[in-house]
Structures are given as C-alpha cells and as structure tokens.
Amino acid sequence: MKEYLSDYEEVLKEQQSSEDGLSSGEAEARLDKYGKNELEKGKKDSLFKRFMKELSDPMIIILIVAAVISGITAFYEGESFADVIIIMAVVIINAVLGVFQESKAEAAIEALQEIAAATSKVLRDGKQVTLKSDELVPGDIVILEAGDAVPADGRIIECASMKIEEAALTGESVPVNKIVDLLQLNSQKDVPLGDRKNMVYMGSTVVYGRGKAVVTGTGMNTEMGKIAKALSQAQDEATPLQIKLNQLSKILTVLVVGICAVIFAVGLMRAGISNETILSTFMVAVSLAVAAIPEGLAAVVTIVLSIGVTNMSKRNAIIRKLTAVETLGCTQIICSDKTGTLTQNKMTVVEHVADDEKLLETAMALCSDAELDRDSGEAVGEPTECALVNDAAKNGLPKPELEKEYERVGEAPFDSMRKMMSTVHRTPDNKIIQFTKGAPDEILKRCAYALRDGEKVPMTDQVREEILKNNKAMADRALRVLCASLREWDDVPQNTEPEYLEKDLTYVGLSGMIDPVRPEVKAAIEECREAGIRPIMITGDHKDTAVAIGMELGIISDPSQAITGAQLDDISDEEFKDRITEFSVYARVQPEHKVRIVKAWKARGMITAMTGDGVNDAPSIKSADIGIGMGITGTDVTKNVADMVLADDNFATIVSAVEEGRRIYANMRKAIQFLLASNLAEVLSIFFATMIGFTILQPVHLLWINLITDCFPALALGLEESEPDSMKRKPRDPKEGIFAGGMGFDVFFQGVIVTALVLLSYVLGHRMESGVWEFVNSPDGTTMAFLTLSMVEICHSLNMRSRRGSIFKLNSHNKFLYGAMLASLILTTAVIEVPFLASAFQFTPIDLEEYAVALGLAILIIPIMEVVKAIQRKTGK
C-alpha cells in the first residue's frame, strides 16, 4: 500500500489502528511481531580480522613465503635465522601500520542509530505517553511538535502549519510544508520522496508547527532502513593502487621463480648432478632469489601513504582508508551534493525590491516567529524566517529591539492553504499596524494599495503587473520570493480571523532568498576543470534551483545539461551509460538515483568520487571509488562510509586533497622505481657472477641494502613536493600499469648501469688487494661491491627526485632526503668498520683509497642519468 496515495482513514484501517492509538496490549504484541524500531547494526571487523586482512596483501604473501623458504634454508644449512627474523619483522610492522591507520574509522551503519530520536510522544490507550523511540510499532499515533526528531515513517493524520526539515534524507534545504490531504499522481504514476507532503520520515526534524501521524514503517522498513540495507549490500572494490601493486606482485613472483630456475640450472651445470649438489645448489638459488625481493617495498608504500594521510589532515582532509590517498590522484569525476557542500545550507536574503527597504526588512522580521539568539547573533527557528530575521539584523534592525518598539498584540498564524501569516503590532507612537507576509501571488490578491515614493497609491493593473514581473525575474534566478504588506488600524482588531485581517492590504515589497553557494566553491570547480576533473552536481532540490546554482558555479552552461530523477527513471541503464556525458546537474533525485549515476560513470571506466553530507548520500558514497563526507554538517552515517572526510566542509579542500593525492602517487612511483632498479641491479649482479662462477654478495648483504640502505632514501622520496604542473595535467589513466610512462625502461636501464658499476667495483676491490684482475671469490671484492652498491643507491636517490627533470634545476630542496642519505651512509660505513658487524657480514677492512674509488664510481650515476634525462626530454619519452 502506498500510504501517501491513500486517505489517512484508509491507512488507519490498514494499520488496524485509530486516532486514539493502540492499546498497550496490542502494541506489545506488535513489538514482538515487528521487532524494535531500530536499524540493523553493521558487523564490525575485529582487530585480529583487520590484521589478517593486511597479511592477505599479495606483496606481503611474497614476503611470508620468502621468510618460510629462508627458514628452511637456514635449518638445512645450520645457519642463523636472522633473515627470517628480519623479513617477518618487516611483515608485522607493515601490517601494524595499516591496521593503525584504518582502525581510526568508526563503525559504518551503527551511526544511523544516532539519528533516530531517543524518545517519542505517543497515544496509547487514548492517552499521551512518552516512550523510547525503539518501542514504536506500526499503527502507533505519534505526536510531533517543533524541535522533535521524527522517530519513524508515518502518514500524517493531523497537521497545523507543520514544516519538516528533510535535507538529510532528500537533499532539499527548504523545509517541507506538510499536509493531511491526498496526493495526486504525476506523469510517472508516482510521487517522489521529496514531494510526499502527507508523510513523515525517520531522521527528519520538525522545525515549525505541530501534527500527528500514524506509524507505517519502523526499523529497517523505513526509508532510512532502505538506505542502511543499501549500505550493507554495497561491495568494496579494489582501488587502482591495489590493482597495480597486485600486478607488481605477480611480476615479482614470476621474476623470483625465474631467478631460482636459472641459478639452479647454472649451478648444476657447473657443479654436476648429485643428491648433495642438487640440495646445496637449490638452497643457494632460493636464498639468493629471496634476498632479491624488495622487502622494503610494501613498508615504504604503506609509510608514504601514512605520511600523505598526515599531510592531508593538516589540510582538513581526514583520510579513513590509506588507499584513498592514491585514488584521489586519479579521480576523473566528482559527484557532489548541492546542499551544504556547494551551498551553505543556510537560506539567505540576497535581494530586495521595495520603495522603502527599511520598512520591508522591519515587516519581514516582525511578521516571523524566528528569534535572534543573543549569544550567537544568529536567528533560531524555521530557516526561511531565520533568513529574514538575520537580514534585518545585518541591516541594523535586530528583532529584539524591533519587538520592544513594536509590541505584538495579535496574529493569524501561517497555514499552507493561505500561504501567508499576519501579525498585529502597537507602534512607538501608539498606532496599530498589521504586517502580512507570504507568497507574492496570494498577497497581491488581497492588496488594494501599494507604496510608491513614500505614498500609498491604488493597486492598479499596471502596478500589479510590474510587481509580478519583478517576482518572475527573481524566481527565474531560483530565488525563493516572499512578499510583505501592511494594514493600518485605528484600534487593536478584536477579530483575528484571516478573512477579517487579510484584506485591503498595502503592498510593501519583495524579498528574494536562496541557499547561497560557498564563496570558495567557484574557484575550486575551476581548478578541478584545469586538473581534468569533471564536477557533477546531484541534488534532491527542484530543477530550476539546481540549474541556477549549476550555471552560477560553471558546472553547466545550458539548462539542457540538467535532468531530473523522474526523467532518469525513463532511461534504461544501457542508454544512460551512453548518454551520461550529456548531463552535469541532476535534480529531484532519490538515493537509488545517486548510486545509479555513480555506477554509470564507473561503467565507462571513470574513477568517480562522491561528496555529500546527508544520509541520502551514504549509499552512493560507498559505491563510489572514493567517498567524501562532510565533517561539520555531515551525518555520522556519511562520515563512517566515506573514504575521506572534509573537516571544514569546504569543497575547495577536495582540490588540495587531489593535489596531495597526485603528489603522493608520483612520489610513490619514484620510490618504487628506485627500489626496483636497485633490486634489478642485485639480481643481474648475482646472475652474472653465478654465470662466471663466483659469489659477489651474500643474501644477508642484499637484505641490509634492501631494508637499510635503500629504505631511508625511498621514504624521503615520498616527501618530495608536487611538481609545478601537477594540477594542470589530466588525471592519469587508472588502467595504466605501474611501469607506464617509460618507467619499465627506466628501471631496466638504471639497473644495468648500477650492475656495471658494481661488477667493476668487485674487480677493482680484488685488484687493489691482490694486484690481479680476475673474477674469483674474493672477500675484498665482496666488501667493495657492497660499499659501491650502497653508495650508488645513495647517490641515485638524488636522481630520483625528478623522473625527467635535471636535479640541478629543481626549485625546491628535500631536507629529509639529505638526512636519509647521511643516515644510510653512516650505517653502511658502520657495518664495514665496526668489528663485530664486519665479522658478522664477513667484510674485510677498507682503506681511504678504496672508499675514494667506491665514491667515485657511485657519483658517476649522476652525470650518466643527467645525460639520459636530457635525451628523454628532447625525444619526449
């Protein structure tokens, strides 16, 4: 049964209730049948489950497998388990970091509980009682007054000028005038949620008047419950970063297996086949392959993302999921709620048309029930009336002062049939004046006069036509227009019936108001466009208002680029996917429309973000690649399903967050390239050494370089500033691989250069001690190769500050990188010079001449890369 299309008496009959409410016994039976009026709680992952999720990452699985194989190798060869301990320490630290960041998030659907009213006034056994809201059942009669939160969905059975704020549910900033009457079907044979004026919904708030409603839905059977269900059904999808790292993990897995196979085969060819040589060669191959895995990569990525989270929080963007940092950087579509996100969610008077503006402001403020709070200086009450009272106060007419001068002595309250209200006042000179405000067309029907040049003149057709023309011009700009009039009395009228008061009025003027756009939003949207990001406005508000706001902000240039939810219902999913680029403003939409819009963009392969503050935004926020909630005006529901929360509710903060996301991703690629080039050099060095027949470096040496020497500079690269044109470029293609843009070639070329320098240093190290040029097992050569590889990596980190730009032309300095280079150099020197460390690593003493040679070889990487970058810049590769 569609209650809003049925007479309330039919609804009472359907619910087997009456205007006196249910009996206590019947209510108790229904509570057993329907359950409590509460929303199902979302299941929260335990700390252990979150920890295990971190361990299921493919990169981490590779490390765990490496640790297991290292353990087996150490056990069979009777060696130390140091490698195992080091690798598992990396795994655990990485998982703890991930859990720590994401454990800051609150439970998602449980927050919906906080929106429901704590207690409700209900008729039971014909008497008014106050109950906990979770005890309500279908058929209960709920009494609603200004300030009450609506505890359940219901059909209105009694209404006295009741207005309800439904912005959190529908997105409309203007309170809805509620009625008892039956609604009429539209062309779509239904009535949108925001137009169901004879219904009340859980999660909304009564801001004016009073009424009664019969409960038609509780708990998960409310509109709020439908949203909660949609949230629980929405599935989390892998982010672009997760996809790329998974691809990288597969590549590394294949590479490691390949290394094992090649080294094992070469070892057997050289040593011959026997049980002993098979086992020993296999253990050597596996241990070297394990050591060649970039053990620090997962930790570096996690820490760089964590640093990005910290930086974003300083810019008022609170990240709830680490991977959201990178996703922001490739966002192509931002679907934004209008109310409270693009606009201020505060009705504001922006225009007057009056002969006497001071009189107009006085009339509007006095003929209102909103009050000016002395502490905050802001009006409190129904939003439209608050706008009028605030406007008067802003222009030197605070309502408390006006009320002292103009005592209210009579009134005819507002009702939705008349569309106006009247108040009668005694003036400072003891005269009686009546102010009437309301809908312009209704007020003008009752006006016999108009104020012109300070004089009261007859209301002619010409004057009326001029007023209506001004009214239309304001309405065409999506302003909500109210008209004020007055009537003078010789004495206080004893009859305050509207029919008696509201006639022979004198027109005073028009006030136009709107929920204004945030002042910084237009510039933020322009920045989004420069960054190749398309802003989309989605709202539950009327189409005319949405079009006006959209055109003012530059989101659309023509009304044809706007579409309503009802029109959207007439388009199939397939057709909508093809036509979605035609529309940038969506009006009169419901929650399911928002999810559909997000899914249509995603179906076209676009990385889509959704911002919003109301409960109605939550399902689409969860469906989007990145959901952005509002920290101040946002409901807990929205915040808890969002990937990012704007602490200042400022749309412009998104631009800063996008820039930070792009910076973090670019820096992460630099760090990944740096680490992989180092590991490739290690792999190639081991491969060539094995082919020739000597051991260049031991697994423990490689672990030290991977986790100590390389990690500090790699982390510091994550702190590089944004490139100057980062927000002038289009978002990168989310489908592009981790090695896109020539990174694969860069890794290979740099790995080859470093390999050549390391092999040369090995020969030089052996030659400087033995006087012979040869490739043989040599502790001196190994020590020299280790020192040179470490120093080359330290110097190469400078090259990685910019993948294509010359390091001598960078405008910024990275003091963290300089510190990281120094730390790596000190630790590298310590492991060679400190006796017990040198003994553990089987290093031989190094003199100053050898240090100078190693440093000279290391520095060569800088001019080599400068030449390569210059060629790449010239060729555009």
State the predicted function of each range.
Residues 771-772:
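Conduit-forming functional cores of very large proteins
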